[in-house]
Amino acid sequence: MINQKKNLKRKFGSNGFTLIEILIVVMVLGILAMVIVPQITVSTTDAKNSTLETNLVAMRNAIELYYVEHNSTYPGMTTDAGVAIAASWATASAAPTVKQLTQFTEVNGAVSTTKTATAKYGPYIKGDTFPANPFSATAVATAVKCGDSAIITVVTTDGTTGWMYYPQIGKILANHL
């Protein structure tokens, strides 16, 4: 019986790991995980912040360019047919705003899907929607909600859309909780 154990040792060798060695490796891996995982989380948040800032700058520039090219009228203050609307009606729907910034427009704000002699302005934002808000839920990240105040005193968010737009003053904000 003893000879059989010696034969097995020779056959398979005694190169296995001891329990102490395995515990040391597990502890080292645990320490590395404790250091690396928070760094990944921080860099993800930094990336979202950077994306949000870039998207806000692009949309604010688009809104200001629209304002300059459309006789000092912000997008959403006319219907997509180019008819001026009262400030109270501008908050009812964000559809004209989105169309006016993502399609070609005439000087009065009328929307066209193709560039023509009169619909020569825009599109100011690529695609059919606003860029996604990286902090919003996927289903609402590109949606826009129009605010109902010409003066923003306290910015409140409800998380129902990716963006909050105030057409009376051309202000756009991230709308996330």
Protein language model features and the residues they cover:
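Conserved catalytic core of two-component sensor histidine kinases
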Residues: V26, E53, R60
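Membrane-proximal amphipathic alpha-helices
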Residues: T45-L56, T73
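C-terminal juxtamembrane segment of a hydrophobic transmembrane alpha-helix
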Residues: L29-A47, Y67
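Short, glycine/small-hydrophobic-rich surface segments
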Residues: I63-Y121
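N-terminal leader/signal peptides at the extreme start of proteins
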Residues: M1-F17
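N-terminal signal-anchor/signal peptide hydrophobic helix marking the start
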Residues: N15-V26
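Short, surface-exposed interaction loops/tails
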Residues: D128-A132, S136-L177
